[in-house]
């Protein structure tokens, strides 16, 4: 049964076309602030219901509850603060209770009702969210670059930005209809920012054996250098689905969402977001949303013990490897053979092979997938 959205109601903060014309006229009278591309993506996730029950950027009470308790002030699970940072001089003429226009590259995208202006401790944010204050962590580095004050308040979205992959993006209101049309009662979601290798395929198919449908949901948004480009990920998955999945058991759609690399906290966040899209189950990977050695391999599994009231079932499927003796993809639970027979698939090693223009061996990646990736002149983010 498709779950109710987080908090019970799917948020929609998109202004109707009738109201939009009047509000756009009003925006010229309002103070405005320029926001970053990452905050524009947050705006879209709030307005389109991906971040339900949030209706805007967090006020201080919710921010502090999430920071220290991993719950909103109403006790609903929520693990990553969704905040709008500004410099004091940008809001010198703004007070609590005012409406402001939010712009990106001088185009107005939303109106925000400023409920609260408050300060924050970036180092403490990093310590709680990322479990490290090391500026070499990409999420921590981003945090330290953010501005000094935070604005909390509800938003109304006036414009959706164009994106070269917008035809790939579905929002919760669309996926919920789609899953119902397919008559899927159980849907397992798979979060990714990578092209698929045989280990991913193994995990997805293991989950699909006891659910009605698989929802492959790659992130479109800020990625770190060395990650695969969005269009490469989609093309690679299309090849995999075409050649190695039965018809009508997979939905592939993009999600505009920022990647924080916040490990365990972000694993829970990813699950909540997929619940809003209509998923009943969520695959949690080994070192999910991790980076480097900042988190223990299965720390992202353990955190779910703190959230029995999440409303989506996490699936912990062990990392797959190729066993020469078994003759296929297996994991530690089902393979009795020693390490000398096991070939582990490393994403880093795969990248190195692809960077050299070499086709990876079949036990690492399907040849049809490799062919598509290698057809791109440069598959990586710089």
Curated annotation (Swiss-Prot):
EC supergroup of this enzyme = transferase
Q: Which Pfam families match?
A: ATP-sulfurylase (PF01747), PUA_2 (PF14306)
Note whether Nucleotide-binding occurs among the keywords.
yes
Q: Which positions form S-S bridges?
A: none
The protein's annotated catalytic reaction(s) are: sulfate + ATP + H(+) = adenosine 5'-phosphosulfate + diphosphate
What pathway is this protein a component of? Sulfur metabolism; hydrogen sulfide biosynthesis; sulfite from sulfate: step 1/3
HAMAP family from the UniProt entry? Sulf_adenylyltr
**What family does the Swiss-Prot or TrEMBL record give for this protein?**
Belongs to the sulfate adenylyltransferase family.
Q: What is this protein called?
A: Sulfate adenylyltransferase
Which organism is this entry from?
A: Staphylothermus marinus (strain ATCC 43588 / DSM 3639 / JCM 9404 / F1)
